Amino acid sequence: MSLSIDVTSLPSFSSSIYKNESSATASTLSGKSIGRSVQYVSPDAEAFSKYMLSKSPEDIGPSDSASNDPLTSFSIRSNAVKTNADAGVSMDSSVQSRPSINVGCDQVDFSFNKGIKVNANLDSSISVSTNSRKEKSKGDRKSRKHYPKIEAESDSDEYVLDDSDSDDGKCRNCKYKRKYFALRMRMKQVAMQLIEDL
């Protein structure tokens, strides 16, 4: 069995992040926060989205997530599996469980542009060989009769040979004459029995 999974593209996401500006010293060039005490995101959400799309998921760290405080930080790799192709999944679903701090709201929607291609091939071969025995029917058992053995010396002396059986008188005094006639009589009986059974 061979299983191959082809992920043709990384998950793309569009983020709409709105936060209150808490410091006047903010970096507007890089689009990410300067330090833990500074909670600022550039108001240009489209530029931030392009910046996030240009990086691979392995290279994205806490500084790229637009929030360095533990209350609003999130991991893209751990939440990227919770996506729906038709509708994005809001990753800020636990806002109500957070303490009420004036940090604003952040929402990131994930969606796959291209699906995951899965190829699974299962190759198997089954060979079955059976030996069937043919059960003997009752008719076969009835037709098989045990005939008595014919002795070499028979009591009957009346054996007549035809002209076709005689070979210029050489067989008249043959010592196997009685065995021959006994065998011929037995073969006639077997032939008659076969004709009756049919």
UniProtKB/Swiss-Prot annotation:
GO cellular component annotations of the record: host cell cytoplasm
Molecular functions per Gene Ontology: ATP hydrolysis activity; magnesium ion binding; nucleotide binding; RNA binding
PTMs per UniProt: O-glycosylated.
Modified residues (Phosphoserine): S67, S154, S156, S164, S166
Coarse class of the protein's main subcellular location: host cell
A matching Pfam family: Rota_NS26
Location(s) in or outside the cell: Host cytoplasm
Binding, Mg(2+): D92
Its biological purpose: Plays an essential role in the viral genome replication. Participates, together with NSP2, in the formation of viral factories (viroplasms), which are large inclusions in the host cytoplasm where replication intermediates are assembled and viral RNA replication takes place. Orchestrates the recruitment of viroplasmic proteins such as capsid proteins to these factories. Participates in the selective exclusion of host proteins from stress granules (SG) and P bodies (PB). Also participates in the sequestration of these remodeled organelles in viral factories.
Subunit text: Homodimer. Interacts with VP1. Interacts with VP2. Interacts with NSP2; this interaction leads to up-regulation of NSP5 hyperphosphorylation and formation of virus factories. Interacts with NSP6. Participates in the selective exclusion of host proteins from stress granules (SG) and P bodies (PB). Also participates in the sequestration of these remodeled organelles in viral factories.
Protein name, per record: Non-structural protein 5
